[in-house]
A protein has these predicted regions:
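The AdoMet/dcAdoMet-binding core of the Class I SAM-like
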Residues: 1-66, 74-81, 89-91, 106
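Alpha-helical scaffold elements adjacent to nucleotide-binding pockets in ATP/GTP-utilizing enzyme cores
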Residues: 83-87, 111
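Soluble small-group transferase modules, centered on the S-adenosyl donor enzyme superfamily
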Residues: 94-141
């Protein structure tokens, strides 16, 4: 936290509907962070292949798309994680999963999922293979 004052001049937070904002801007970003929920459920409109394609066009070359994914049933149900990773793999060349404990907010497991077209190096990633992948999330429109 001591480093935050040094980053304030470089950090710009935007509070808006993420998908609508990205659709309406020509700006490009080094990172886009998706940590959105409707109650305990993820905001599906930001997790679909259509939304991720919009986000990708808003990233600088080599930029990183980061999303927080919460499991259900005390970490037993990772179906949304599997679908989110599957969908990200359709849009980005490289997708990694990093487990994040969140004991202060309950028993659910959190995962940080990072995607980019550039291979970045991250520690403590969870390996996965094609058997882990499930369904591509799509708009219902």
């Amino acid at each position: 936290l001591e480093e935050i004052p040094d980053a304030i001049d470089r950090l710009k937070l935007i509070t808006a509907d993420g998908r609508n904002y990205l659709e309406g801007t020509a700006k490009r970003y080094a990172a886009i962070i998706n940590d959105t929920f409707t109650g305990k459920d993820p905001a599906l409109s930001l997790a679909t292949i259509e939304a991720l394609r919009i986000a990708k066009t808003s990233l600088l070359p080599g930029g990183i798309y980061a999303t927080n994914v919460v499991s259900e049933q005390e970490g037993e149900d990772i179906s949304f994680l599997r679908d989110a990773v599957t969908t990200l793999n359709e849009v980005f060349a490289h997708v990694v999963i990093i487990p994040c404990e969140d004991t202060s907010f309950g028993l659910e497991d959190n995962y940080l999922v990072l995607a980019s077209d550039l291979a970045h190096s991250f520690s403590e990633t969870l390996p996965y293979d094609d058997d882990f992948l499930r369904n591509v999330l799509r708009d219902s429109r």
